[in-house]
Amino acid sequence: MKLNKYFVIDFDSTFTKVEAFDVLADISLHDHPEKEERKKQIIQITNQGMDGSISFRESLERRLNLLAPSRQHLSPLINQLRGSVSESFKRNKEFFQKYADNIYIISNGFKEFIEPIVTEFGIKTENILANEFKFDQEGRVIGFDMENPLSANGGKVEQLKKLNLPGDVYVIGDGYTDYEIKHAGLANKFYAFTENVERENVKKGADHITPSLDEFLYLNKLNTVISYPKNRINVLLLENVHPVALALLKAEGFNVETYHAAMTEEELCQKIKNVSVLGIRSKTQVTAKVLESANRLM
């Protein structure tokens, strides 16, 4: 289907639930005597890069030196990332297949581990823009392509300028570098993706906060499998309802609130007003008065 809209999507903590470098650290440093110390340093360097105290390129170089990755680490990394795709992305695989020509993955991560994940959703290889490793003859990572704009500050903005997409551009991501695309005037809207992580400075600059891909598709009338986003359905669980039930509801994308004890009739009357699903145990009494207050209960 021909569509005059383009979707620019981040990878780490957006397409996947995790940061790939965090997973890579557990793999490449698994038997390293300085594993915990190096992981702490990597986090510190990442934060320094994010707050601007060091350049993104310096952050990348220093983290790779600490990680000391090689080709042999890529296969287990890819396997773990494959199992860490965001739940709402998994639910909407048809969207990626239907609009493959219009979807771009733009990431400051590395193509070697991004491509195997996103191409399984139908995303085209040529629409994946990311950094690329450089290897020595033994397969050890010795650096990255420094000519790639994504290895430096403002890389995503530079890539969007080069693409010069002929239509409306919608950016979906969790990070400040995603917001920068909109700030530079290269996107019509920026959607702060909060399914996995929430960053206040990113949310402040967003046109819309989207807790799931379902919400984004609903807002833009692109729904393929869900007619109404589950994140808009409020669920209230009282009296320490079993954690498995909580996990399953959250995995499905519902907006879940929990309370450890039972509620009085008055408390429940106030709390239930915007609740669609109520989970209780024996101590909570759902009276006629409570039901009168439940204007959204299914």
Question: Where do the language-model regions lie?
Answer:
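Conserved Lys-Pro-Asp/Glu-containing loop-to-beta segment of HAD-superfamily phosphomonoesterases
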Residues: S151-Y179
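Alpha-helical substrate-recognition element adjacent to the catalytic core
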Residues: K2-E132
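Short, conserved loop/helix-junction motifs that constitute active-site signature segments
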Residues: G122, H183-G185, V290-R296
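Histidine/lysine/aspartate-rich catalytic loop segments that bind and position anionic ligands
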Residues: G122-L150
